[in-house]
From Swiss-Prot:
Function noted in UniProt: Participates actively in the response to hyperosmotic and heat shock by preventing the aggregation of stress-denatured proteins, in association with DnaK and GrpE. It is the nucleotide exchange factor for DnaK and may function as a thermosensor. Unfolded proteins bind initially to DnaJ; upon interaction with the DnaJ-bound protein, DnaK hydrolyzes its bound ATP, resulting in the formation of a stable complex. GrpE releases ADP from DnaK; ATP binding to DnaK triggers the release of the substrate protein, thus completing the reaction cycle.
GO cellular component: cytoplasm
Protein name per UniProt: Protein GrpE
GO BP: any one term: protein folding
Compartments it resides in: Cytoplasm
Length: 243
């Protein structure tokens, strides 16, 4: 049997209050009862059971709707989280790419600086080697110039003697001195030979005496020659200078 039923506005279940519903009632054959009141109670109980069944079904439907809404909300949350993860992944990749690019640039500059340093070091060592090689005989020349000077002074003094035998010895010594100087010059020794009247140069001349004579700052007399090894002065020429 199909029955249309409208629930009262004051029905205890707020979800059903004021609503009109349609439901079916299955009436089972019962044994006849002579008690009219009992028959009436049975009908009321059947109606209440139908209402309860409907209420439970409606409640289940509402619960399903709530559950679907929760699932939808969770899906939205998952989508948002996935988007954030994707954005962070892109940002992280960009940061990694930027870092790799900077690392490559730094490594390139570091390699360039290292290569430059290697070239400078190589050049320095080569120059240092050449410098040491160039002046390797300096100590020898420093030790030999004083005896060489004394030998020259002795020759100059002997050449002024009237004795022919002494002069012959002096000539032989002078030849030996010139040969020695030629050999030393081939290894970089330079004789500083000032001339009388030359301008005094403090870098290669040593003024042992000043005289008020002639043009100022001129060489008046040479006491001894000077020596230098390549561009290094080992012993300046000893001179007398006008002031």
């Amino acid at each position: 049997m199909i029955i249309n039923y409208k629930f009262s506005d004051f029905y205890f279940d707020k979800k059903l209050s004021g609503k009109e519903v349609e439901f079916s009632i299955q009436i089972q054959k019962r044994e006849a009862s002579s008690d009219k009141n009992l028959q009436s109670k049975n009908l009321i109980i059947d109606a209440i059971n139908v209402q309860r069944d409907f209420s439970e079904k409606n409640k289940s439907s509402d619960n399903l709707e709530i559950l679907n809404k929760q699932i939808e909300d969770k899906n939205d949350l998952i989508i948002n989280l996935e988007k954030k993860v994707f954005d962070l992944t892109l940002e992280n990749k960009k940061n990694i790419d930027d870092f790799n690019e900077k690392a490559k640039s730094f490594a390139k500059k570091a390699q360039e600086e290292l290569d430059k340093y290697k070239l400078e070091l190589k050049s320095f060592l080569e120059n240092e080697f050449e410098e040491k090689k160039k002046f390797s005989f300096q100590k020898l020349f420093e030790n030999i110039i004083n005896p060489l000077n004394n030998f020259r002074l002795a020759i100059d003094a002997g050449s002024k003697q009237e004795n022919s035998s002494i002069k012959s010895y002096v000539q032989g010594f002078e030849m030996l001195l010139n040969q020695t100087i030629n050999i030393l010059e081939s290894y970089g020794l330079i004789i500083i030979r000032p001339e009388i009247g030359d301008t005094f140069n403090p870098e290669v001349h040593n003024a042992v005496e000043l005289r008020e004579e002639g043009t100022p700052n001129r060489i008046l007399k040479i006491n001894s020659l000077g020596y230098q090894f390549h561009e290094r002065v080992l012993k300046p020429a000893s001179v007398i200078v006008s002031k």
